[in-house]
Regions:
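Hydrophobic beta-strand positions
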Residues: 1, 66-67, 172, 207
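N-terminal segment of the mature soluble domain
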Residues: 1-35, 39-40, 73-76, 105-109
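Short hydrophobic alpha-helix segments
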Residues: 5, 77-81, 183, 218
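N-terminal post-signal-peptidase region of extra-cytosolic proteins
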Residues: 20-29, 45-51, 154
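Soluble non-cytosolic domains of exported or imported proteins
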Residues: 21, 25, 61, 85-96, ...
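C-terminal/domain-edge helix-coil "capping" segments
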Residues: 30-33, 67-131
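Amphipathic beta-strand/beta-sheet edge segments enriched in Tyr/Trp
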Residues: 38-85, 96
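Charge-biased low-complexity segments
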Residues: 88-89, 104-262
Length: 262
């Protein structure tokens, strides 16, 4: 564990605004400033809920993000909610449940750190990144053409937490019309990353071409999630030029663990 005052000073130094919708590059920068192997961020709130007429209760929820420093990837996300008659009772139940789950979080971090990363398989075909429209490589290149639109589901956890977020993934599109590797480069938690991956896997497309011949291509796919609105998909060209709008920020101290950092 790191001293809390040192962490706060490091976060202030890099201008961290409390976002829980980070790109892998942003997460790596954050962990470098803190100096850690993993860091935990999250969102927590207590709200009045009603499931039927003349009934109401208090719900306390927490979304826990465990982020790996080296890759900036989301190593684990956990969503927990507790209901009770009063806000204090709901919050106490939530804290107790978080404390009970803390050992599993530590175990997951240890497993992640010790795991042997499997190298990506060698592509049988050459894969091109989408070129900048103004670059010489853009001449004769046509990006993949999508034949359908797949709307990812807005998860129940995101609904409960009223999440507005963006999920980005670098996706390989093969010449045979198959989807290749999907690498999440901006994660959102709350089940939205999995929803985006599932939607990407259902895309149908005509492959990219260069000088009229099919070529494998790697493109950035972006899904914007908002409550009560349909998630929208956008393919970026070039893939890493535009930064999405900042999501709603909400960083809460979820709990103070008493165990050692793995």
């Amino acid at each position: 564990m790191l001293d809390e005052s040192m962490v706060r000073a490091a976060l202030a130094g890099i201008g961290y605004d409390g976002s829980i919708n980070l790109s892998t590059d942003e997460a790596r920068g954050l962990s470098a400033a803190i100096g850690c192997d993993f860091f935990i961020i999250g969102k927590s709130e207590t709200l009045a809920r009603s499931e039927r007429e003349r009934e109401s209760h208090q719900q306390a929820y927490a979304g826990v993000f465990i982020v790996e420093a080296r890759s900036g990837a989301l190593a684990m996300f956990d969503f927990i909610s507790e209901n009770a008659a009063t806000p204090a009772a709901a919050e106490l139940a939530l804290i107790n449940r978080l404390s009970a789950r803390a050992p599993a979080y530590v175990e997951r971090m240890i497993e992640r750190r010790l795991s042997i990363q499997t190298p990506p398989r060698s592509f049988i075909e050459e894969i091109e990144d989408l070129p900048d429209p103004d670059s010489p490589r853009a001449a004769g290149f046509r990006p993949p053409e999508f034949l359908n639109r797949v709307r990812p589901e807005y998860s129940s956890a995101a609904e409960q937490a009223d999440i507005t977020a963006t999920v980005e993934a670098r996706v390989v599109f093969y010449t045979n019309g198959e989807i290749g590797q999907v690498h999440i480069t901006r994660w959102a938690g709350f089940g939205l990353d999995e929803s985006a991956e599932h939607a990407i896997g259902q895309l149908k497309f005509k492959p990219a071409t260069r000088d009229g011949k099919p070529v494998g291509a790697r493109a950035l796919i972006r899904y914007n999630f908002r409550r009560l609105n349909e998630p929208t998909m956008k393919i970026e060209q070039p893939p890493d030029q535009k930064t999405p709008d900042k999501p709603v920020r909400d960083l809460r101290e979820l709990f103070k663990p008493t165990y050692r950092r793995p």
